């Protein structure tokens, strides 16, 4: 199946964050098996998985990998998916996942999007899709800060270890009236809420959206506006959506970018999405207990966003939801990475904005 067919036919069916966050770098090729479960949002009959072999955003200080870095040559030796009722439970009848009819696939260094063939599962809402893959290679992408339990290793029983490639989308061919993407950093991804709780703000927003709307969580820990603005595969995924929420700025400021630079990056992102026909709900930079120069840039950037300097379709001011009362609105009331309570508040407000955009 071509990626054009994939994006035309399949939409995301989990609110778990999805990204190529960092490169695993083993000194020599290894054969590893990995397993992870995804809670399905809407359910459906046919599923397909999306992958790529490039990094989405710079990890930490960039010493390990940076945005758009290419993974090396590696092989998918086997892949299976099945259904379970709860995360961590063994799947029922697992099915082999194929690529153009073949059960294995060589992934080229730096390869862009590629996808699996469809698999029939007939999942109900709330079921878990169990993904299992065996690969061989030494330089491949994985998601270090995934808010799911990932088991991987060279021998059973597999230990908790996230170094295994995971899908960028768990796609279902259930029809969707509109596709909504959530582009952002660890706050969007869901860090701050318990592992496998699906209590992050994107999940809470999804619960308040119509059943015929799909939600794709494009949040990634350490995510930066400056990286999304490079117009790589990360932003390319967002461009396939009808509406995208954009929430950046914390990591940019903490890594030394000025308010002016953050605003320029946000303008670049919004304009690129508009050129693709995607409408944008822009969130102000969330509170993160910044101090000194960082605090000054936080206030300056947010003042400019609220004034309309970034040409988004709608603006959602996050500070009154997650921050303390003025003059301390830069301080987080629910943790820099919002906890369950903070995520619930933000999710409900975001859903109100999105539901309004759906009828405009």
Placement of each model-derived feature along the sequence:
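Catalytic His-Asp segment of secreted/periplasmic serine-dependent ester chemistry enzymes
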Residues: 286-360
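N-terminal secretory targeting modules
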Residues: 1-183, 188-189, 193-195, 358-360
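Alpha/beta-hydrolase-fold catalytic nucleophile elbow
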Residues: 247, 283-284
């Amino acid at each position: 199946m071509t990626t054009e067919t994939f994006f035309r036919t399949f939409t995301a069916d989990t609110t778990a964050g999805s990204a190529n966050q960092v490169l695993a770098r083993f000194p020599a090729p290894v054969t590893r098996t990995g397993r992870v479960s995804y809670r399905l949002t809407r359910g459906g009959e046919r599923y397909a998985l999306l992958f790529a072999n490039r990094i989405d955003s710079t990890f930490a200080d960039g010493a390990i990998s940076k945005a758009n870095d290419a993974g090396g040559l590696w092989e998918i030796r086997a892949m299976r998916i099945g259904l379970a009722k709860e995360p961590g439970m063994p799947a029922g009848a697992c099915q082999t996942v194929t690529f153009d009819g073949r059960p294995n696939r060589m992934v080229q260094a730096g390869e862009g999007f590629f996808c699996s063939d469809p698999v029939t599962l007939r999942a109900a809402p709330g079921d878990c899709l169990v993904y299992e893959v065996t690969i061989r290679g030494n330089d491949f992408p994985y998601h270090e800060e995934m808010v799911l339990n990932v088991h991987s290793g060279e021998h059973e029983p597999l230990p908790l270890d996230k170094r295994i490639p995971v899908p960028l989308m768990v796609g279902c061919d259930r029809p969707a009236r509109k596709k909504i993407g959530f582009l952002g950093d660890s706050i969007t991804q869901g860090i701050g809420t318990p592992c496998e709780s699906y209590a992050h703000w994107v999940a809470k927003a999804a619960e308040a959206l119509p059943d015929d709307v799909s939600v794709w969580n494009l949040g990634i820990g350490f995510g930066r506006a400056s990286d999304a603005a490079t117009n790589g595969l990360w932003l390319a995924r967002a461009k396939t959506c009808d509406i995208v929420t954009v929430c950046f700025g914390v990591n940019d400021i903490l890594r030394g970018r000025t308010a002016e630079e953050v605003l320029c990056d946000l303008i670049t992102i919004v304009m690129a999405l508009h050129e693709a026909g995607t409408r944008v709900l822009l969130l102000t930079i969330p509170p993160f207990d910044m101090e000194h120069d960082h605090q000054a840039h936080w206030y300056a950037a947010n003042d400019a966003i609220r004034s309309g300097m970034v040409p988004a379709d709608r603006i959602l001011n996050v500070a009154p939801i997650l921050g303390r009362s003025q003059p301390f609105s830069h301080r987080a009331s629910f943790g820099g990475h919002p906890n369950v309570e903070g995520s619930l508040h933000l999710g409900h407000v975001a859903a109100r904005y999105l539901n309004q955009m759906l009828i405009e």
